[in-house]
């Protein structure tokens, strides 16, 4: 990557949660730099964690001064979070046109999980203005950036031994109905929330052990999938909660003796947990996942459950994060402890599906033979282990601190320690 296609931010604390704002900033058409807004969260082993919104320096700050006098990013707003956030996400792009009952039209929402589901409101009511010269140098106010806690939803556990909600591991925000969020928990449950009314719609025991991640089927308000410590990927339909569909189970290890203490007929030997699940937004038949401590990424097809249709092998250490771009091209980014970000173009490997067959679990089965892919189309070597990544929406071309201009398109943000880098794809 060249200096013209990379931006960097050094946070005051180790970064864990990371997400790119998906809705246009006020004035974004006139000021492309304002679309660079990232939500980030800290990870420290105490009750003093924080979340923050960071953005690029505004063009109007840089009118008279040399671009290189300023860091790329600045903190726009921040708030205390207590325990670390296990996940942080901005509202979906569709939320800006959603009929909210308790939200200002000009504000944007963030959500975090940890000891509870928290919904935050980010506002930028007061435009940033440049004041007169002070001491021969232009100064600027901080603008009206505010990040305030809107709702805390701790929930109640279905598990008999729990009187209060157990810690939440992750969540998924529904794109079609942004008032819906589904959370996953270490107490084996998933809970569907209506954040507009601050109520739990339903809670179900989803797995035999901890649930680590959850994702809505794109385009659906009823179907979601989850992965967990029991090594399974399961699909649930809110219209029929009596049963779930097991789409994939990690292979049981060889030469492991069966459990000795009168196991139930459904007991399985210990298997490798699945940590993350992510749908391809361009074709929701396809999902990506990876095992705990695993260096391979499995690509699964809902039309062909049971085994991966693709396996991506190029990382040299455990994978920590993955994410699909929002374009029609199925571009997948993966990152891990080998200090690498790899981009995979899977267009030539995927079964083409028509619009009518998308989002259907009973579509015709494609050829289920697993393809092993070991040639990413792009690689970026970082200075340390990468713990998180986030794709941007489409962003217009803009002037960099060097004075050069970037092409329009997507950016990819990665987190490693206290550093965040934004890479032009």
Describe the residue ranges of each PLM region.
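Loop/turn segments within WD40 beta-propeller blades
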Residues: 20-26, 31-35, 89-106, 171-178, ...
